[in-house]
Regions:
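Hydrophobic face of amphipathic alpha-helices that form TPR/SEL1-like repeat modules
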Residues: 1-70
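Conserved C-terminal structural/oligomerization subdomain of aldehyde/semialdehyde dehydrogenase
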Residues: 3-9, 14-18, 65-74, 91, ...
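Glycine-rich loop-to-alpha-helix module at the N-terminal edge of alpha/beta enzyme cores
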Residues: 55-56, 60-62, 67-161, 446, ...
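Residue-level signal for inorganic ion chemistry
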Residues: 68, 89, 104, 127, ...
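Short linear capping/connector segments at secondary-structure termini
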Residues: 126-133, 165-169, 362-368
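Rossmann-like NAD(P) dinucleotide-binding subdomain of oxidoreductase/dehydrogenase enzymes
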Residues: 128, 147, 157-311, 508
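Short beta-alpha connecting loops at secondary-structure transitions
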Residues: 133-134, 210-213, 237, 257, ...
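ALDH superfamily catalytic-core signature
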Residues: 228-233, 255-256, 261, 269-418, ...
Length: 542
């Protein structure tokens, strides 16, 4: 029990280091990258309770940009490991739930400071190696965003605990905020180290225990996350990491009566399937599970005739091609007015041709490799379709090569059909499709933006006319959960732009805000009457 009312240190966003030539952080991360690259024998275990669990099934880990090189192996589990992880979580739950909220906060605040200091180079290097992010993309993800999640979430937790009801004379009303009764299942993606950690840490902070299944292609940095949490003092069993096939884990988790919540980032199809499975088993559960998910996107950039050409071009290049377009928020469809297209096309093509591609070890590279062969083959299929289409002209890029790494050129295609395949479907790669519209058709184009895709994650409007900005913001109110004015549709900062979308893009529970943490607590109202009545009768009965 706490003996005081405590104030969490007020969070500010972690400054992004520059990694410019001559800076100490540049030398440190390069040294760590090369050290980890040449380790070769790393063996990533599963973390179940206080045990590092290894199996006979060893899966190789290789850099996407150098897929013949083996960084090491991770251990693949099965049904028994998932069951053991659930048992370990439930065993840890009573003590973790009873720990005062400020003590839980202290653990994750320490983890943030460890990431900001001694673990910064390691988690960035791991993300560069195994997820093929350039150093800037690794820094804003694995270091800064993760640090921000941990610090801001502690602040948001205090905000939640401060929400208390009014009391009348003779009565004291109060609210307490409990973890969910059972365990939370976290299924996390490859593309953001920070998201993978936060999907575990956010519910854990609120007093929950976690079974975590990371993406196979993110296990390398997932191990560093577990190292950080352990160094910060997280008790054994609070977060349990298992690596196995998704259906294997799901078959155990979704039939367990103590399943209390799903925290998910991944594809829309998988999320819908999981929701269906939970629905089928709803009668098995002790409580109705909380379901929180952020899924796909087909994110747009809409330029108005009043837009600045250079701002649009920069927004398109950064929004579409940073991290090879493998962000849920990446710009993948653009609508450009005829009056600006000639100038935008010239500068856009020139910029894309300037982009260097290769290993993240070479800091001049803007783009590196896509995550794995399956992703490469899928994207290459879209490129083939674009090249063969009578409705499309590829004006930049269009080639791919997987001989050494899974490299796909940043590609810009122009279509005459605004509902063509690459304007509708999520590609998750460095492919931008542009539709050029008559200036007079802006109203119709907004309808097109709103109805073309099943998703509603991010979008951007570029315009100088304030009336246009106001009108587009209102007209496209449900087209994107994160809407950007004169900026690229990526790069949401924790505490500044809470992230998430609706429609086919998820439950819009806004990671990076207090809204997400509310989903991971079960409130209890306590009413205390100081002088209770001593007879059942009411005055009207006299």
């Amino acid at each position: 029990m706490s003996r005081g009312n405590f104030n969490i240190p007020y969070p500010i966003n972690e400054p992004v280091l520059s990694y410019a030539p001559g800076t100490p952080e540049r030398e440190e991360v390069l040294s760590k990258y090369r050290e980890m690259y040449h380790q070769n024998a790393i063996d990533v275990p599963m973390y179940i309770g206080g045990n590092e669990v290894r199996t006979e099934d060893k899966r190789p880990m290789s850099p996407p940009h150098d897929h013949q090189h083996v960084l090491g192996h991770f251990n693949y589990g099965g049904v028994d490991h998932v069951k053991a992880a659930i048992d370990a979580a439930l065993k840890a739950r009573p003590a973790w739930a009873a720990l005062p909220w400020n003590e839980r906060a202290a653990i994750f605040l320490k983890a943030a400071d460890l990431l900001a200091g001694p673990f910064r180079a390691k988690i960035n290097a791991a993300t560069m190696l195994a997820q093929s992010k350039n150093v800037f993309q690794a820094e804003i993800d694995a270091a800064c965003e993760l640090i921000d999640f941990l610090r801001f979430n502690a602040h948001f937790m205090q905000e939640i605990h401060s929400v208390q009801p009014d009391s009348q004379d003779g009565i004291w009303n109060r609210m307490e905020y409990r973890g969910l009764e059972g365990f939370v299942f976290a299924i996390t993606p490859f593309n953001f180290t920070a998201i993978a950690a936060n999907l575990c840490a956010a519910p854990a902070l609120m007093g929950n225990v976690i079974v975590w299944k990371p993406a196979d292609t993110q296990v390398y940095s997932a191990q560093v996350i577990m190292e950080v949490f352990k160094a910060a003092g997280l008790p054994d069993g609070v977060i349990n990491m298992v690596t196995c096939d998704g259906p294997v884990a799901g078959d155990v988790v979704f039939k367990h009566p103590e399943f209390a919540g799903l925290h998910f980032t991944g594809s829309t199809g998988v999320f819908r399937h999981l929701w269906t499975e939970i629905g089928k088993n709803i009668g098995l559960y002790k409580s109705y599970p909380r379901i929180v998910g952020e899924t796909g996107g087909k994110d747009f950039v809409l330029a108005h005739a009043s837009a600045d050409v250079d701002e649009v071009v920069t927004g398109l290049v950064r929004g579409a091609f940073e991290f090879q377009g493998q962000k849920c928020s990446a710009a993948s469809r653009a609508y450009i007015p005829e009056s600006l297209w000639s100038a935008i096309k010239e500068k856009l093509v020139a910029c894309v041709k300037e982009l260097k591609m290769g290993s993240p070890e070479q800091f001049e590279n803007f783009v590196t490799a896509v995550i794995d062969e399956r992703s490469f083959d899928k994207i290459q299929g879209y490129l083939t379709g674009l090249a063969e289409s009578d409705e499309v002209e590829i004006i930049a890029g269009g080639k791919a090569d997987k001989s050494k790494g899974y490299f796909v050129e940043p590609t810009v295609a122009v279509t005459t059909n605004p509902r063509s395949k690459t304007m509708v479907e999520e590609i998750f790669g460095p492919v931008l499709t542009v539709y050029v519209y008559p200036d007079s058709s802006f109203e119709e184009i907004m309808d097109l933006v709103d109805t073309t895709s099943e998703y509603a994650l991010t979008g951007a409007i570029f315009a100088k006319d304030r009336h246009v900005i106001d009108h587009a913001t209102k007209r496209l109110a449900h087209s994107a959960g994160n809407f950007y004015v004169n900026d690229k549709p990526t790069g949401a900062a924790v505490g500044q732009q809470p992230f998430g979308g609706a429609r086919g893009s998820g439950t819009n529970d806004k990671a990076g805000s207090v809204l997400n943490l509310w989903r991971w607590t079960s409130a209890r109202t306590i009413k205390e009457t100081f002088v209770p009545p001593t007879h059942y009768a009411y005055p009207f009965m006299g």
